């Protein structure tokens, strides 16, 4: 991609995003009146912009998640730590095995464990893109590239939420978060990617 295309897209997306956020945070937002935005979604955006005002409400889990990841330091507190101050044992995060599983990983396995998870997810996504580049036909390339893009996008959003870089979205961490529908969908997608790769070898 050329820089002209990249800057052109940014020139359109950034102002639109700023306008959307400005409309979303208004008390009587037109986005809520039109049904484009739900009230709980507005609260999530507000809690991201003003965490101190929502520290006991919508921002509670994200703030505790950041604390948990930081408390793991380099090596972590150990697998299934019994410390009452941990996010699991202290119930500081509701259902940590779902959207906020990375907070538990950061706390129990530290920076090293967190980096390992990120690298593994990145390797899976890169392998999908590699299969897409070698695919025999366009449909196979789209399937493999789509799965790679999905894993990268979903991982980025989830990690952004857990580290409070992004507002809470409810997206799971691929292959790790608890959730039958998410896991089955991802495994089915990876099965398609493996099939595309098999077709490449046969060709």
Name each model feature, range by range.
Residues 111-155:
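Hydrophobic transmembrane alpha-helices and their immediate junctions
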Residues 8-16, 115, 119-123, 187, ...:
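Generic alpha-helical transmembrane segments of integral inner-membrane proteins
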Residues 1-5, 123-133, 193-200:
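Structural signal for the C-terminal ends of transmembrane alpha-helices
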Residues 18-23, 128, 189, 193-196:
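Structural signal for membrane-spanning alpha-helices in multi-pass inner-membrane proteins
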Residues 154-203:
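A juxtamembrane structural motif centered on a specific transmembrane helix
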Residues 104-107, 147-151, 179:
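Transmembrane helix-bundle signature of multi-pass membrane transporters/permeases
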Residues 70, 74, 124-127, 134-137, ...:
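Hydrophobic alpha-helix feature that most strongly marks membrane-spanning transmembrane helices
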Residues 6-111, 139:
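Hydrophobic, glycine- and aromatic-enriched re-entrant/interface helices and adjoining loop segments
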